[in-house]
């Protein structure tokens, strides 16, 4: 399949260029953009003229196979900051669950305080994981890609090993 150059422009970043083929999926370009900008794939919208490109489709499906250079525009979608219901799962025999209402902008420290309110485990003794990552102080919940219904897993520090 013929190769071409994909040029992506946006308001926030300098021009980005990638080598691509017409059989490549749009998602591959999304991943290149994510690697350079740290903008998650779901927060990106790629435009060809005014047409929104779908991640699962091949570039050739947009009728641009005769070009050597594809010019795309990147728009970044800011996720809303409404409260999201999350389930906190405690470690232990029962695996008790608690409902927490958390914003994407909530700090990890704020979430740990919420957890203390429902479990009585102080923040310093909490180990909380979300989407396979340990929550770190100084970060916000958006850093962990939370969605409605995401699970938080709580384990407490074990003394003596």
UniProtKB/Swiss-Prot annotation:
One of its GO terms (molecular function) is proteasome binding. PROSITE patterns: UBIQUITIN_2. Its main location: nucleus. Residues 3-77, 86-159 form the Ubiquitin-like domain. InterPro entries: Ubiquitin-like_dom, Ubiquitin-like_domsf, Ubiquitin_D, Ubiquitin_dom. Can be acetylated. It is found in: Nucleus; Cytoplasm. SMART domains: UBQ (SM00213). Signal peptide: none annotated. One of its GO terms (cellular component) is cytoplasm. GO terms for biological process: aggresome assembly; myeloid dendritic cell differentiation; positive regulation of apoptotic process; positive regulation of canonical NF-kappaB signal transduction; protein ubiquitination; regulation of mitotic cell cycle phase transition; response to hypoxia; response to ischemia. Belongs to the ubiquitin D family. Ubiquitin-like protein modifier which can be covalently attached to target proteins and subsequently leads to their degradation by the 26S proteasome, in a NUB1-dependent manner. Conjugation to the target protein is activated by UBA6 via adenylation of its C-terminal glycine. Probably functions as a survival factor. Promotes the expression of the proteasome subunit beta type-9 (PSMB9/LMP2). Regulates TNF-alpha-induced and LPS-mediated activation of the central mediator of innate immunity NF-kappa-B by promoting TNF-alpha-mediated proteasomal degradation of ubiquitinated-I-kappa-B-alpha. This is Ubiquitin D. It comes from Rattus norvegicus.
């Amino acid at each position: 399949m013929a190769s071409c150059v994909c040029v992506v422009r946006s308001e926030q970043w300098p021009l980005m260029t990638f080598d691509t083929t017409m059989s490549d999926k749009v998602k591959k370009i999304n991943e290149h953009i994510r690697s350079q900008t740290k903008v998650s794939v779901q927060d990106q919208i790629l435009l060809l003229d005014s047409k929104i490109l779908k991640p699962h489709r091949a570039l050739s499906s947009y009728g641009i196979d005769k070009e050597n250079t594809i010019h795309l525009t990147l728009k970044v979608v800011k996720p809303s900051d409404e409260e999201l219901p999350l389930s906190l799962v405690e470690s232990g025999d029962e695996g008790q669950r608690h409902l927490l209402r958390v914003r994407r902008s909530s700090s990890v420290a704020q979430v740990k305080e919420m957890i203390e309110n429902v479990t009585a485990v102080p923040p310093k003794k909490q180990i909380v994981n979300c989407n396979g990552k340990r929550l770190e102080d100084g970060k916000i919940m958006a850093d962990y890609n939370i969605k409605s219904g995401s699970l938080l897993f709580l384990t407490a520090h074990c003394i003596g090993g």
